[in-house]
Amino acid sequence: MMTNGTGRAGTVRRGAGALAAVLATTLLAGCGPAGTDSGSGGTASTSPSANPKQALLAAVPDGSEGAFRFSGKDATSDLSGVVDPAAKGIDLTAAVKDPEHGFTTRMSFLVVQERIWMKVKFTGTDGLTGLPKLPNRWMELDRSRLTDPDATPTYEGVDVGNAGPIIQAATTVEEKADRTYAGVVDLTAAEAAKAVGEEEVAALGDAARQVPFTAVVGADGNLTSLTLDVPAAGTAKAWTYVVKYADYGSAPKLAAPGGDAAQPAPKLAYQMLNG
């Protein structure tokens, strides 16, 4: 169990997984237990901490910082959005370009409390036919109509990039100048593996036990970035896992869309998500 509030390992990855499901359907047609919010945010420090690992964990967002922006990158996807602890909400978006046909799918999920909406937009589609026609509005989903309800995001804590589980799995942490940290993470730890991707971690073999990372903490004591430099293994190329948090307390607050901005999801939306 981590010392700071976190999202369940893989929260962002499930959002990317839902996007992958939509892409697969489009082309055919044309984590561990939830964390707690019991930790406290960090405070700025100008001198090295006696325990750098605990100092870095204390910088992971815990829900007391207000709404903030995030972005994330793993082996297969890039995501960005907003986390709003007061609304128990997340807004996340991913954009993926189809290498064969050249069009881009931009998919967004909005979660507020127990409700969830989806929005899908295709760009660069000139000359293409067979793409699904969906409303250009937020489509509210009924989770009971999803084959796998866990394939779509839910609000499970503020650390949607799973920085906490990764830092917790660090075997060495050293504090550098300018609030920068560096060390080594053992990705075979269960929660860290779920956060980064269990298949990707398994492919690393013994190298998964010695993955270097760097992290930066802002002047306000809050984590601003965490980067894992994942080495090449077998036929897999080296890649980076990146989490960035920004605009603590100043990001837009989230709320359920109303009026003409939303509608119930049509049958086609469920067909896409259910594959």
Task: Go through the PLM ranges and name each one.
Residues 26-30:
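C-terminal motif of bacterial Sec signal peptides marking the signal peptidase cleavage site
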Residues 2-19:
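Bacterial N-terminal signal peptides that target proteins for export
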Residues 19-20, 206:
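Short hydrophobic/aromatic segments of transmembrane alpha-helices and their interfaces
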Residues 3, 32-275:
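Subset-of-secretome marker
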